């Protein structure tokens, strides 16, 4: 675990730290591990009891000069929410050959395959049915991912040098799975209180709207032009109640989803024929075309150890090619070279400095970044980083780091239509690179009082961004992927036949700064040789600031378009989907072969969310967006106001070593069965019961 942005060896985008995972070499004796788990949700959605479970298998051994590791994993989760499932199978392995002819030389290959069939959950049906997905959220995904990583390592211990070569070929085939509501028109309209004898009246209104509807709604046009829509919406409500007297907003969404599944819509002359044809059973839709993503990667690293220092240089190249039936073919190239120098002074001070040069292009745009060097513009971005660690005394350390970051938008973010939580994840070809820097100052102190020992760590951090990348949720043109932020774009999507989609898109939000404090302590108390208590406590304070909030609020306030979108749910200075305070605690008590433990966490309220979901501003009367939200999400405004007040979640576990090699553990997640949400319409899992059995032999 590397905190802060002090290293250039792991890419230019890791500003807040990273975790480098290394595979353990097999021991002299073969080892097989089997872990089985199964669980059920205590009080989930009402249609049955969804289960989940998984199986992990791994085997490692040495065969003469070969290291062999193979593994398999399967996971099935019905989901505690309707149409929110995950079915995953993974197999992989590692083969390493230690060449006996050359000391310090090893080479081999890692191979991995993943099948993943899943749907997310982003929009609920209503606050009264929070575990049932909206019929508008009808997208899932089926993926097949394969990669093969050849590698070669050579270490000359006499010269203190190491060469590392790594390569990767990666392929992912990804297909959007589209679902439509399985409710019949009869079931939908029956729930809405519809009388079948009203069909001729509806057909007459559709065919003669100039005389049947226009006289009712036209008088409200002056009010609408002045931004007042309550009168018009009142008349629309009366019309809806006339035909659907018992309908809820969720029922209207069922009806809209049913109609959207039977496009193209009729014109005024064939409403009756379209309705008769629409009543017939739908033919099963053909699967969406498969999108393919290919990646080729080559990385080289050379390091030289000196008496008190180490020099590391290297380079990396990655090419990504994406082939989508919707958005076409796109490719990117990323070339980087880096240098890092680490030095240890007077046995107490460790210093690390480095520089990384990045070149990135997408398609034929060869200058995603430009930097002036001696007056000339070159298409590379330099990233400088450095850090130090000083031992103040016994078990007492102070550290500091500073690093620049630069994250290029991926081909997927710019050009590929995907999905998130059952709704569209729309590409944004205008997305720019995010850049910034991070500074951190930390202090770590070990302690020992009798049988208690551990450490306490406190750090302050500051991060500054330019063109920060965040996602926004809203309406989009289904063909051009334009964000709908005005009536003209809305009408254009309808008139052109492009249609509307609901979902999210990555976008640049401007300047931002995030600063705060991270305080934690971990330790263990030994009661006796059979009993010990291990613990971890942590608190994080974060202040996420939108530095352009004043100018953005003024610009949005001046926009009087009825469909004008705002950047977030309130006028505060805070970034979206962040909490200021979070506290966690982990305790594990072991006694002989038994153990009992708990995880506890508390988070404060979410500071701001997307405007398309909630508007927390006070106003004299509802605007058009308020009515639209009520139709799409039910009374989400009041639900969020009542429930966005921070939450506490507690998990418990009890385990036992049955034998030296077999361990059984029972867990209860969300022990208090707390209903909580970190964002609107995302209700956390209810109380969950899990049984795990692990065996090593």
Give each language-model segment a name:
Residues 58-60, 73-74, 96-99, 107-114, ...:
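Conserved C-terminal beta-signal and adjacent last beta-strands/turns
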Residues 77-88, 98, 102-159, 163, ...:
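Flexible loop and strand-edge segments within Gram-negative outer membrane beta-barrel domains
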Residues 38-42, 63-65, 74-78, 111-117, ...:
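Transmembrane beta-strands of outer-membrane beta-barrel pores
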Residues 164-168, 172-178, 391, 397-401, ...:
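Membrane-embedded beta-barrel scaffold of Gram-negative outer-membrane proteins
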Residues 35, 346-347, 460-464, 483-612:
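Gram-negative outer-membrane beta-barrel transporters
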Residues 308-316, 320, 328-464:
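Structural signature of Gram-negative outer-membrane beta-barrels, strongest in the C-terminal barrel
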Residues 58-94, 118-125, 174-179, 305-320, ...:
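Surface-exposed extracellular loop regions of Gram-negative outer-membrane beta-barrel proteins
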Residues 1-2, 14-36, 55-57:
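N-terminal periplasmic accessory domains that precede
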């Amino acid at each position: 675990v590397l905190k802060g942005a002090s290293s250039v060896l792991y890419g230019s985008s890791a500003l807040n730290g990273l975790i480098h995972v290394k595979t353990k070499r097999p021991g002299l004796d073969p080892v097989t591990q089997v872990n089985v788990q199964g669980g059920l949700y205590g009080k989930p959605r009402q249609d049955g009891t969804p289960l989940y479970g998984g199986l992990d298998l791994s085997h490692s051994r040495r065969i003469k000069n070969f290291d062999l590791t193979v593994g398999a994993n399967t996971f099935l989760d019905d989901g505690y929410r309707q149409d929110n499932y995950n079915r995953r199978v993974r197999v992989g392995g590692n083969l390493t050959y230690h060449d006996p002819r050359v000391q310090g030389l090893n080479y081999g290959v890692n191979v991995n395959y993943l099948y993943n069939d899943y749907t997310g959950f982003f929009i609920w049906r209503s606050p009264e049915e929070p575990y049932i997905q909206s019929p508008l959220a009808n997208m899932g995904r089926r993926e097949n991912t394969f990669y093969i990583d050849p590698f070669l390592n050579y270490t000359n211990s006499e010269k203190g040098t190491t060469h590392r070569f790594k390569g990767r070929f990666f392929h992912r085939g990804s297909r959007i799975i589209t679902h439509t509501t399985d409710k019949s028109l009869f079931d939908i309209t029956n729930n809405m209180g519809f009388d079948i004898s009203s069909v001729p009246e509806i057909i007459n209104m559709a065919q003669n709207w100039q005389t049947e509807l226009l006289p009712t709604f036209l008088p409200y046009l002056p009010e609408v032009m002045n931004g007042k829509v309550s009168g018009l919406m009142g008349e629309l409500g009366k019309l809806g109640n006339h035909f659907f007297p018992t309908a809820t907003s969720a029922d209207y969404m069922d009806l809209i989803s049913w109609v959207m599944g039977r496009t193209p819509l009729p014109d005024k002359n064939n409403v009756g024929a379209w309705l008769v044809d629409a009543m017939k059973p739908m033919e099963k839709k053909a699967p969406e075309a498969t999108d393919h993503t290919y990646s080729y990667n080559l990385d080289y690293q050379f390091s030289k150890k000196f008496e008190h220092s180490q020099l590391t240089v290297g380079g990396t190249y990655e090419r990504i090619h994406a082939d989508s039936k919707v958005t076409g073919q796109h490719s990117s190239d990323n070339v980087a070279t880096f240098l890092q120098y680490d030095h240890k002074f007077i046995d107490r001070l460790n210093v690390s400095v480095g520089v990384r040069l990045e070149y990135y292009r997408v398609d034929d745009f060869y200058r995603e970044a430009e930097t002036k060097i001696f007056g000339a513009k070159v298409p590379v971005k330099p990233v400088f980083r450095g850090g130090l660690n000083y031992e103040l005394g016994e078990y007492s350390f102070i550290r500091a780091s500073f690093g620049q970051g630069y994250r290029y938008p991926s081909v997927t973010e710019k050009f590929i239509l995907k999905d998130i939580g059952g709704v569209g994840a729309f590409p944004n070809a205008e997305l720019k690179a995010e850049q910034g820097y991070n500074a951190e100052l930390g202090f770590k102190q070990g302690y020992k009082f009798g049988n208690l020992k551990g450490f306490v760590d406190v750090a302050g951090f500051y991060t500054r961004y330019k063109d920060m990348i965040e996602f926004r949720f809203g309406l989009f043109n289904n063909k051009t992927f334009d964000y709908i932020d005005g009536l003209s774009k809305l009408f254009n999507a309808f008139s052109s036949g492009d249609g509307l989609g609901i979902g999210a898109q990555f976008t640049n939000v401007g300047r931002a700064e995030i600063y705060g404090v991270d305080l934690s302590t971990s330790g263990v108390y030994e009661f006796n040789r059979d009993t010990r208590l291990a613990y971890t406590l942590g608190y994080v304070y974060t202040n996420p600031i939108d530095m352009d909030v004043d100018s953005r609020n003024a610009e949005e306030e001046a926009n009087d378009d009825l469909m004008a979108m705002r950047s977030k749910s309130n006028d505060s200075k805070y970034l979206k989907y962040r909490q200021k305070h979070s506290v966690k605690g982990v305790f594990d008590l072991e006694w002989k072969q038994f153990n009992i433990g708990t995880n506890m966490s508390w988070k404060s309220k979410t500071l701001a969310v997307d405007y398309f979901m909630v508007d927390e501003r006070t106003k004299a009367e509802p605007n058009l967006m308020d009515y639209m939200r009520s139709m799409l999400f039910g009374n989400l405004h009041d639900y969020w106001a009542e429930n966005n007040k921070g939450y506490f979640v507690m998990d418990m576990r009890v385990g036992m070593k049955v034998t030296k090699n077999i361990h059984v553990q029972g867990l209860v997640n969300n022990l208090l069965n707390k209903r909580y949400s970190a964002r609107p319409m995302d209700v956390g899992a209810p109380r969950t019961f899990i049984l795990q059995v692990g065996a090593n032999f």
